[in-house]
A protein has these predicted regions:
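Surface-exposed binding patches on compact interaction domains or structured appendages
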Residues: 1-13, 122-123
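Extracytoplasmic low-complexity segments
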Residues: 52-64, 75, 171, 228-293
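Extracellular glycan-recognition modules
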Residues: 54-125, 157-158, 201, 219-226
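Extracellular, beta-strand-rich glycan-interacting domains
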Residues: 83-93, 204-232, 243-252
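Short, aromatic/His-centered strand-loop micro-motif at the edge of beta-sheets
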Residues: 124-148
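Extracellular glycan-interaction patches encoded by glycine-rich segments
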Residues: 129-130, 183-212, 227-235, 293
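Localized edge beta-strand/strand-to-loop motifs within extracellular or lumenal beta-rich domains
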Residues: 145-159, 219
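Short, solvent-exposed beta-strand-to-loop segments that form ligand-recognition rims
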Residues: 163-192
Length: 293
């Protein structure tokens, strides 16, 4: 309901939403004292009111990364003979052919990313010690669009999902299980070669957009579980098999809380770049207010 206008602006009264449903209205402003022989100016404004989202903040991962300063419970991320990695991602800018963009994982061991030499820059790839896995059906074709991506695996196959649709299955050699909770040899950073979000090997392999709801499980989620109501946007923190859960919704500072029982919180860095053979950055994270779904 319109109330009045003064030098500070227009004033409306808005009632609470009923049953959480969204609503909107159009407001037309018309100039009252138009100059002689001039048509009055009009401005159309659309006002939308909707319930609070399950997600209210995300991380802009461009030239940014998340890492473990130490692992409170590294064992929870090891020996993953069965498992799932999943995240919400939103590409904000295109990259040149041959670019690599990291979602999460360990360089040279088990890494979920986009692109590669001879792989389109926006195509999902699982880079493994025993060889890389990808398929032309795994492209994230639209900019500024949220996608839920998930890779699940057992001791025989890896399964690739986009927005809950199983698009590709491929054989893998899992051996005794993948270890995401240890550091490996590698001189590309002060923190060694380990599990990162949004980074691997060098500063140019950042994710070119927003990320949220990054999760690691020690079991192979089913298609039905991935497509459960609101699973893309939130899961109970005590869910069976949830061993890593970084919502990337912290909103301030650079501590990235692990909401899973493992308690392996991360730190964020921005302005990541190469200097003297090291890949370094500044403490921080670029937070973006955004309501999802």
């Amino acid at each position: 309901t319109y109330n009045n206008a003064d030098d500070s602006g227009l004033h409306f009264t808005v009632e609470a939403l009923v049953n959480g449903s969204a609503r909107s209205c159009d407001v037309v402003l018309t100039e009252k004292n138009a100059p002689d022989n001039s048509e009055a100016l009009t401005v159309n404004i659309n006002i939308t009111q909707k319930p609070k989202g399950l997600i209210e903040c995300v991380a802009d991962m461009r030239r940014s990364r998340c890492y473990f300063p130490f692992l409170k419970n590294g064992g929870a991320l090891n020996s993953l003979k069965n498992g799932t990695m999943e995240a919400l991602v939103n590409i904000q800018e295109t990259r040149v052919s041959g670019s690599l963009s990291t979602i999460m994982g360990v360089e040279g061991k088990f890494l979920l990313r986009l692109g590669d030499v001879n792989v389109p820059w926006n195509q999902i790839q699982l880079a493994m010690q025993g060889g890389n896995r990808t398929d032309t059906k795994l492209k994230l074709s639209e900019l500024d669009r949220w996608y839920h991506v998930a890779v699940t695996w057992d001791d025989t196959f890896a399964y690739f999902y986009i927005d809950g649709e199983l698009l590709y299955r491929t054989g893998i050699s899992n051996y005794s299980g993948f270890n995401l909770g240890v550091a490996y040899g590698g001189s590309e950073s002060d923190y060694n070669r380990a599990f990162w979000i949004g980074y691997a090997y060098n500063a140019d392999r950042f994710f070119p957009g927003y990320m949220a709801e990054v999760r690691v499980w020690n079991r192979t989620l089913t298609k039905e579980e991935i497509n459960a109501e609101n699973h893309f946007y939130s899961v109970p923190v005590d869910s069976e098999g949830l061993v890593g859960y970084w919502k990337l919704n912290d909103g301030a500072g650079h501590i990235i809380k692990d909401h899973s029982p493992s308690g392996n919180s991360m730190l964020g860095e921005i302005n990541v770049h190469s200097s003297g053979g090291q890949q370094i950055g500044d403490p921080g994270m670029n937070w973006v207010e955004m309501s999802l779904p």
